[in-house]
A protein has these predicted regions:
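C-terminal structural segment of proteins
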Residues: 1-288
Length: 288
C-alpha cells in the first residue's frame, strides 16, 4: 500500500502500543491487510495523518480456535481466505465459509482481514449480514481496556461504526448453536458473483420436531448498514413452517427498511429482491 504524502507510518509490536498510537491521534487509522483503506485513499475518501500498521501484532489477533463453550473465536487479523478454508469454520458455521468464497477474488481474500472487513463498515459487504444472522459478537480493545459487544451494536451507518477513538477490533466470536442449524447466504449482483452485492440475505434456522426452533434473517446492501430482522424470528419460532408462513416471514424481512437507490438498483427493486430471496432461503433451510 502506498503511503500518502504527509502521512506517518508506525509499526507497533504489541496491542497496547497500537491502542496508544490510535488514541493519541484522532487522524490515525489502523491498517490490517490494507485492502479497504487502499480503496478509500485511492478515491479521496480518507486522508489520515497517521497509519498504524498492525502487521507485527500476534497472539489472539490471529488464527481461529474453538473455545470450551463451543464459541468460534476468529482473530481480527485473520484473512478472509483463512476463514474460507478453515476446517473449524466449515464445521461450526459452514455458511460463513461459503460466503467468503463469493467475496471478491482469491487474491483479495488472501490479503483482506476479517477485522478490516467489519471495521470498514461499507454497507455493500457480504459478511456483516452473515455474521449478524449467526449472532456474532466483536471483541474490542481500547484505552479503557477490552470489551465485547454484539456486531449489531458495532454497525452504525455508512462507513461508520460505534468504535471510539483509540479502539480497534481484536476478534470476532460466533456462538455455538443450541440445536443443529442450517444456514444460507444469497447475494444478488449486477455482474459476477464476486461483485459487490446489490442485495445480500443471510438466513440461519433450525426445525426440531416439526416446529421452528431457531430463525434469524439479516439483510445487507439495501440501506446504510446491514440489519438483523428480529420480527422474522418472532413470527417463525414455535410454528410449523408452512409455505404460507414462510411467505409471510419473507414479507416481514423486506418491510420496514429505509431502502436506498444506488448504482446497484432502485429502492423498490431491492425490496422485491429481499422478499423473493428471503423466501427461497427460508424454504431451503426449513425444508425437512
Amino acid at each position: 500500500m502506498l503511503i500518502p504524502r504527509g502521512c506517518t507510518l508506525e509499526r507497533p509490536v504489541d496491542l497496547d502500543g497500537a491502542v496508544a498510537l490510535l488514541a493519541a491521534d484522532e487522524d490515525a487509522r489502523p491498517v490490517g491487510g490494507g485492502v479497504s483503506l487502499t480503496l478509500l485513499l485511492r478515491n479521496g475518501f480518507a486522508a489520515p495523518g497517521l497509519l498504524v500498521d498492525l502487521g507485527r501484532l500476534r497472539g489472539d489477533l490471529r488464527g481461529i480456535r474453538r473455545d470450551g463453550d463451543g464459541t468460534l473465536h476468529i482473530g481480527a487479523l485473520t484473512t478472509l481466505r483463512e476463514v474460507e478454508t478453515s476446517p473449524l469454520v466449515a464445521e461450526h458455521s459452514p455458511v460463513l465459509a461459503a460466503a467468503c468464497t463469493w467475496l471478491a477474488s482469491t487474491r483479495i481474500r488472501n490479503t483482506a482481514t476479517l477485522g478490516g472487513h467489519l471495521g470498514h463498515a461499507d454497507p455493500h459487504q457480504d459478511l456483516p449480514p452473515v455474521l449478524l444472522a449467526l449472532g456474532a459478537q466483536v471483541e474490542v480493545a481500547g484505552p479503557a481496556g477490552l470489551r465485547t459487544l454484539p456486531l449489531d451494536d458495532l454497525l452504525v451507518g455508512y462507513y461508520e461504526t460505534s468504535l471510539e477513538q483509540g479502539e480497534l477490533i481484536t476478534a470476532v466470536r460466533v456462538p455455538a448453536a443450541a440445536t443443529p442449524v442450517r444456514g444460507k447466504y444469497v447475494k444478488t449482483t449486477a455482474r459476477t458473483v464476486e461483485d459487490w452485492p446489490a442485495v445480500g440475505v443471510a438466513v440461519r434456522a433450525a426445525v426440531v420436531e416439526g416446529r421452528v426452533a431457531e430463525a434469524d434473517v439479516a439483510v445487507g446492501s439495501v440501506t446504510v448498514r446491514a440489519h438483523l430482522r428480529p420480527a422474522v424470528r418472532d413470527l417463525l419460532v414455535g410454528q410449523v413452517p408452512t409455505d404460507e408462513l414462510v411467505s409471510e416471514a419473507a414479507r416481514t424481512a423486506a418491510e420496514g427498511l429505509e431502502y436506498a437507490s444506488d448504482s446497484f438498483g432502485s429502492a423498490s427493486y431491492k425490496q422485491t429482491v429481499v422478499r423473493v430471496t428471503a423466501r427461497r432461503a427460508l424454504q431451503e433451510v426449513l425444508a425437512p
